[in-house]
Amino acid sequence: FSGDFCDSSLCLNGGTCLLDQDPQKPFHCLCPEGFTGLICNETEKGPCFPNPCHNDAECEVIDDAHRGDVFTEYICKCPHGYTGIHCEIICNAPLGMETGAIADFQISASSMHLGFMGLQRWAPELARLHRAGIVNAWTASNYDRNPWIQVNLLRRMRVTGVVTQGASRAGSAEYMKTFKVAYSTDGRKFQFIQGAEESGDKIFMGNLDNSGLKVNLFEVPLEVQYVRLVPIICHRGCTLRFELLGCELSGCAEPLGLKDNTIPNKQITASSFYRTWGLSAFSWYPFYARLDNQGKFNAWTAQSNSASEWLQIDLGSQRRVTGIITQGARDFGHIQYVAAYKVAYSDDGVSWTEYRDQGALEGKIFPGNLDNNSHKKNMFETPFLTRFVRILPVAWHNRITLRVELLGC
């Protein structure tokens, strides 16, 4: 090559023309990705052309020597927040610290601060993002030289990031300025996320004040049951509210359309519904049973407290259902919720099958809510393909009252 450019119109599809000293071939085309041939007129074929990966993911060809037991000819390198073979699954959903889907017993810490003569417990279960109140976060003991707080997710999940927030204690801002993240599959042996190029444990940047949010996404998603945050530098005290981001390992746990109203009202029905003081204007209709629904009448309430009552969702077509989130509500100050329930499913809305664990003879009873507002998430060990889903209350507090979301794909 002479290194000089020539008329690029000689090369098609955006190719760059370079002069060549060979008289047989006076110019050479540098073809853009996806094109080949003397004048870039042929579409390049191969496992990565066209790119099979979604969401701007990079496609990398695997050569035969390194393929081993991997039968695909390529892998997709997913950008932050995506997962799946083709990076088609969004994996940065809040895992439940803020909503209460992660229960108090799942959160533990090395220590906690006891304030105001020991009456104020800055306990680990308070470390929930945006939690309000005077005592509204976790604070490590002043005497704890190696503080940490951890979450047991109860099963292996894909964890892709963390959102941290400080709090105000005794009128002063306290927060975590830098921290490490450790993880474990068994709760005994922990490893730290590593920095780039063997630089040791990765140090994450934390907060700058007591109320702002700091999002840190992990370079490589974790597939773990336990996640531990380890403060390194704190402002005044090691005080923390936080949320974990990620998704189920299956990737099939997206909301199926109750909360966002993609399931229309007519597809949400029930055995009956309650009218406060018998007035139609004060009806707790089935289609109010949408997770986090707001308003004075914001949930489904059954007419009677009976195990024969049910709430039914028609998904419109057959879907793979992998889990459920339930929530109670409040009726003029009275806290109401379903404390335990069964799940049934049907393809035609007539013939029903109660969900049961593998090998079980009876329908599984799922633990429900403990209050009117927290989320309670239950995942099905054996997901099912269905169109119709029924929730069958077994135990309740005050009245049978439900807000709900189904999960799946």
Curated annotation (Swiss-Prot):
This is Lactadherin. CDD domains: EGF_CA, FA58C. It is found in: Membrane; Secreted; Cytoplasmic vesicle, Secretory vesicle, Acrosome membrane. Residues 2-41, 44-88 form the EGF-like domain. The F5/8 type C 2 domain mediates high-affinity binding to phosphatidylserine-containing membranes. Disulfide bonds join C6-C17, C11-C29, C31-C40, C48-C59, C53-C76, C78-C87, C91-C247, C234-C238, C252-C409. InterPro entries: EGF-like_dom, FA58C, Galactose-bd-like_sf, Neuropilin_MCO_CoagFactor. GO terms for cellular component: acrosomal membrane; extracellular region. Glycans are attached at N41, N372. The keyword S-adenosyl-L-methionine does not apply. Pfam families: EGF (PF00008), F5_F8_type_C (PF00754). Keywords: Angiogenesis, Cell adhesion, Cytoplasmic vesicle, Disulfide bond, EGF-like domain, Fertilization, Glycoprotein, Membrane, Repeat, Secreted. Contributes to phagocytic removal of apoptotic cells in many tissues. Plays an important role in the maintenance of intestinal epithelial homeostasis and the promotion of mucosal healing. Promotes VEGF-dependent neovascularization. Specific ligand for the alpha-v/beta-3 and alpha-v/beta-5 receptors. Also binds to phosphatidylserine-enriched cell surfaces in a receptor-independent manner. Zona pellucida-binding protein which may play a role in gamete interaction. A motif (Cell attachment site) lies at residues 67-69. The lineage of its organism: Eukaryota, Metazoa, Chordata, Craniata, Vertebrata. One of its GO terms (biological process) is angiogenesis. Residues 91-247, 252-409 form the F5/8 type C domain. It is a peripheral membrane protein. It comes from Sus scrofa. Mammary epithelial cell surfaces and spermatozoan. Also present in testis, epididymis, uterus, adrenal gland, tonsil, muscle, heart, lymphatic gland, thymus and kidney but not spleen, liver, lung or brain.
